[in-house]
């Protein structure tokens, strides 16, 4: 008799999922970088491609009608690939100075990961940050009690979300297969698409997410009705992207995994 299959691994995103409540670091640094180049985008416009590799994020924003116009107004010409590289290098420099400051764990992460490990699961992690950027984040997370079994970045796989290759690399490093025994948990549409493209289970987390986009103080200042409205909006965004499950809080994840295990 074959043993019943169970989920073997959870792959977490970083900013907005396990650290940096509201995914504030990339938003703030993108805003600072674009302003240094004479370009002003709204927070919503910066958030729209969030979850992509950062150079691809910059190119996506500058490829919009507004992005092209802002660039042409500032420089009297269209942008080129050298310009994308220049903006990216500026972004990296800005992020390097602040990323560790934004690496506080989101409430419930440490306890949830401990419970998942007790359930026998491996913990993978992936991010839109580069390996160099993560050198500043990983030690700060470890000091707070969070140390995933692996951390995969876009420069390792050469491709970022929504491709599945960072999930596949976690599977390779931790010897986990097939994809249906993997849960991808994140806080952006790109996270959901990445999980689906990998053939894994995709779970969207609302509290602390980029989709909600508020820092911890802003979120906690909301009344219950305002929180409920934001949660419903975020839930719809995740479900429209194809999420298998949407949870309000990361602490609900072990229960979701138990439900998935029952269905396998």
Predicted regions and their residues:
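Asp-based, Mg2+/Mn2+-dependent phosphohydrolase catalytic module
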Residues: 1-8, 110, 114, 118, ...
């Amino acid at each position: 008799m074959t043993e019943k299959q169970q989920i073997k691994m959870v792959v977490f995103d970083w900013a907005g999922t396990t650290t940096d409540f509201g995914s504030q670091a990339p938003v703030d640094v993108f805003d600072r970088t674009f302003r240094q180049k004479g370009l002003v985008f709204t927070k919503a416009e910066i958030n729209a491609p969030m979850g992509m590799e950062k150079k691809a994020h910059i190119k996506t924003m500058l490829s919009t009608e507004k992005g092209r116009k802002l660039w042409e107004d500032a420089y009297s010409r269209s942008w080129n690939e050298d310009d994308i590289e220049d903006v990216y290098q500026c972004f990296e420099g800005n992020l390097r100075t602040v990323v560790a400051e934004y690496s506080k764990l989101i409430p419930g992460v440490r306890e949830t990961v401990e419970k998942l490990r007790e359930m026998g699961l491996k913990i993978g992690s992936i991010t839109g940050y580069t390996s160099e950027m993560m050198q500043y984040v990983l030690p700060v997370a470890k000091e707070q009690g969070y140390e995933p079994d692996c951390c995969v970045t876009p420069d390792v796989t050469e491709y970022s979300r929504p491709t599945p290759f960072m999930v596949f690399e976690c599977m390779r490093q931790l010897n986990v297969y097939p994809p249906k025994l993997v849960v991808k948990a994140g806080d952006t549409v790109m996270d959901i698409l990445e999980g689906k493209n990998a053939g894994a289970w995709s779970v969207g987390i609302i509290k602390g997410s980029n989709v909600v986009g508020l820092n911890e103080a802003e979120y906690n200042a909301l009344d219950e009705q305002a929180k409920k409205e934001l949660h419903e909006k975020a839930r719809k965004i995740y479900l429209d992207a194809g999420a298998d499950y949407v949870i309000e809080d990361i602490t609900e994840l072990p229960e979701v995994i138990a439900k998935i295990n029952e269905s396998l």
